[in-house]
Amino acid sequence: PCGFFIVDSFSFSGWPVSGSISAISTPLDSSFTTTQRTKTWENVTIKEIGTEIAGRAGIALAWDVEGTPFTIKSVEQSEQTDCEFYMNLCNTYGLAMKVYAQKIVVYDREAYKKKGAAAVLSPSSMKSWSWQQDQAGTYTGGEFTYTSPATEKEIKVTVGKGSRILKQSGKADSKADAERKIKAAVAKANHGKTKLSATIVGNASLVASQCVRVVGLGKLSGKYYIDTITHNVSGSGGYTMDLEMSLVEE
């Protein structure tokens, strides 16, 4: 099974008569994606925030991040839905969030990219494919500037080196907090610079966040991370899946 889904739209057309059903994976409690909230979260971890938000939505939090969760001194949820706020917060710190099997799943995408391939894709298993590489927007390091809450002095934190430095500024609790944020920003900017899209015969064992090994495409072959999967079922084409993938640098 692919998990639990809620039908959000359906349509019919003719002739011949055909129908289309669209469904999304989301908690049964619609407030998770519709109710805007304003709250100041203080002295709390991302995991603790997720536990409270998941509980409010009537589902569980699945936390798959190594290490002890760090404490955030304060973060504002300002007229945002729980879904929007929590996804943005996770992204800020280099974590990914998805709703799957009636759970909010939080994981470290960079750590997942180091896992072994869940399947091998060859040209014979692809109904169609397309490849794209974009060098613009990739970085060798980063610099984050913030004002110290204690001294009110401007502090710069740098990671990496080279000529392509991503520069950001904003709020940070400490140097360690600023470093987490800029590392996450660099990883996010570099992810997906090489993309592969493929349509394959349906394989329900594959899920987004897994890696696959692509073979038989010459220099385009390699290990790819699955960003998204779209499942398609039709009377003429059977069960197929559209995979959007990003190359994993090895």
Report residues per predicted region:
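Surface-exposed cap/loop segments at beta↔alpha junctions
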Residues: 1-60
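Well-ordered beta-strand positions in beta-sheet-rich domains
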Residues: 1-6, 20, 38, 118, ...
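Short, compositionally biased
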Residues: 6-13, 39, 110-113, 225-236
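Short beta-strand-centered interaction patches in the first periplasmic/extracellular domains
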Residues: 18-21, 25-29, 63-130
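Solvent-exposed, acidic/flexible segments
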Residues: 39-47, 75-83, 205, 219
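Polar, S/T/G-rich
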Residues: 44-55, 79-87, 91, 132, ...
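An acidic/polar, Gly/Ser/Thr-rich interaction patch typically located in mid-to-C-terminal regions
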Residues: 126-250
